[in-house]
C-alpha cells in the first residue's frame, strides 16, 4: 500500500523553548491540601473576575482568550496536586482531604463554567476578531469555549442557568462519592485452603490470614480474577462473584438512580431529548441512534459465535461435574463464565495460564515494554533515582525525543495494590503538555496506576498474559499524554473525542499477541529461558478464544449505559439482568447489582461505554493497514503514528488524524475479522 501523505507537523521539534520542570509535589499534609484548595479557588476566580468585568470594547485575544488559557494551565497542575492523592495516597487522612478538595474544586469548576459574563466576552471576541488572524488551534479553542458555553446553557434565561448550575454541582459530588465508595471498599471473605482448590501455591501464599487462620480473599482485581478463573469449587466462586457484584450495593444504587435522573433533567433543560444525545453531540458517533445501530448490528453478528461458545462451555461444565462428583444443573451461571472461558483456553488451545505467567516477571515485562515503546516512537526513557513520589513502590521516568535529545515528559508507574488505592488500571494526566504563559512549552507528566500481583519473598510479581495486555494498553495512554504537542491544555494528550480516546492504546495491545514483541518482554523468572515456541504459538492462536462471549458482554455493558441514559425509568439492576439474558445468554446472579459497581457510569463514561468497541474499529484498522503491512516494529510507521495520531492531542478532529495516517477513510473490515467474523472479500488476519 502506498504510504499516506505526510502528517501535519512531521518535524517533531517544536519552535517553543521547552521547560522540563516537574511542577507536581506529593508532600502536602491533609491541612495543607485544605488551605491550598481555598487559595487556588481564590487565585483562579480573580482571573475570571478580571475577564468578566472588562468593558466589551477592551476585550482582546490577550486579555480574554489567552488569559483563560494561561490560568487553565496553572489551575490544572495545582488541581491535580490536590485531587490525585485521593486515588493513591497510602494515608487515609490525605485521601479524605483530597476527596474533599475534589468536591470543592468540582463545585468551583461548575461555577466558572457557568460565568455568563465571561461567556459574553468570548462571544464578543469571536464576532470582533478576524478568524484568519488566529492560529488554527487558537481559533479551535475559541470555538470550543463558545460551544461549551452553549452546552452549559449560557444562552438561556438566568433562571434556567441557575437550575443547570445546581444540577451540575450535585452531579459532580455524586460521581466523586460513587467511586470513593468503591475505592474504599474493604470487604473480604474468610476461606479455607480447601475452598480455594485449583489456585496455585504462590497465590495462596500471598493471601493474608484472619485470626482463626482462614485466608482473606478481598474483592480487588488481583484476588477476584484469578479466583474466578482457577478455583474449581463452584460454591467459592459463587460467593465471591456475588459479593463482587454487591459491592456498595445500597449506597451506590441510590447514587446511580439520582445521577440518571439529574442527567436527564439537565439534558432536557438544554433542549436534548436524552442525556445520551447531549453527551454524544461532542463525539464521533453524534447521536444515540447511531450508537444503538452499531451495538445492535454487532450483537447480531456475534450472537451465533456466542451460541457456539456457550455450547462448548456447557460440555466442559458437564465433564467437570462428572469428574468432581458435582450435580450438573445444565446451565451457565455468572460465576461459571470466567472459569470455563479459562478452561477453553487451557483445553482447546492448550494454554496453561499458570505456566505462562512464570515467563512474565514484572521487571522483564517492564524492561521489554519500555524498550518496544522507545524503539517504536523514537523515544528514550530514564529512571530517576530518588525521585519524590507518593509511595515507595512508585517509579518516575523522564522521556526524551531520541533524535533531538529534548525532554518531552515524565511518567510515574504505580503498579501494585494498596488499601484505599484506586482499584483498576488507569492513566492519570497530571501536568498537561502545552504552552505556558511565557510561550515556553510545559512538559507533560502522567501516572500509570495499576493493581498487579505484588512480589512475595519467594517469587517476583508474575503477570497473567491479560495483565501484560492491560499494561500495554494503559501505557499507550501515557504515551498519548507525553507525545502530544498541543498549544492549549484543553487539547493536550488524551483530550480527544471520548469514542476515539481508547483507539491509540487499543492499537498497541496488538503487540502482546505477536511473537517478536512477546519474546522481548518475557523470560522464565527462575531459569531465564525464553517462552517455548509451542507455548508461544498456542498463546497467539488463543486470541480468538471466547471472542464472542467477551464482546457480547462488552455490548451488554454498553447497552446498560445507553439504556440508563435514554430511558430514565429503567431500573439499573433489572436492565442489566435483562440484557445479560437476552444478549449474553447467561443470567445475572439474583440479588446482585452490577451497575452499582460500574465505576465508568460515574467516571466520565456516562452514555459513552460503547466507545471501547467503537474505537476498536479504528485501532484494528490502523494496526492491520499500516503496522501489519509495513512491519510491527517499523520505526517509520511508529513515527508516522506518533506524528499523525499522538502529536495533535485534541487539536484536530479524530477523523482528520485517521485519514492522514491510513491514507483513506477508516473501514470496519479489520475490526470484524479480529472478532472472528467473516467479511466478504477479506482474508482472516494471519495469526
Swiss-Prot record:
It is an enzyme of class 3 (hydrolase). It holds the Pfam family Peptidase_M3. Its main location: cytoplasm. GO terms for molecular function: metal ion binding; metalloendopeptidase activity. Its cofactor is Zn(2+). PROSITE patterns: ZINC_PROTEASE. Its EC number is 3.4.24.15. GO terms for cellular component: mitochondrial intermembrane space. Ubiquitous. The active site is at residue 474. The keyword Cytoplasm applies. It catalyses: Preferential cleavage of bonds with hydrophobic residues at P1, P2 and P3' and a small residue at P1' in substrates of 5 to 15 residues. Binds 1 zinc ion per subunit. Involved in the metabolism of neuropeptides under 20 amino acid residues long. Involved in cytoplasmic peptide degradation. Able to degrade the amyloid-beta precursor protein and generate amyloidogenic fragments. Also acts as a regulator of cannabinoid signaling pathway by mediating degradation of hemopressin, an antagonist peptide of the cannabinoid receptor CNR1. This is Thimet oligopeptidase. It comes from Sus scrofa. The gene is THOP1.
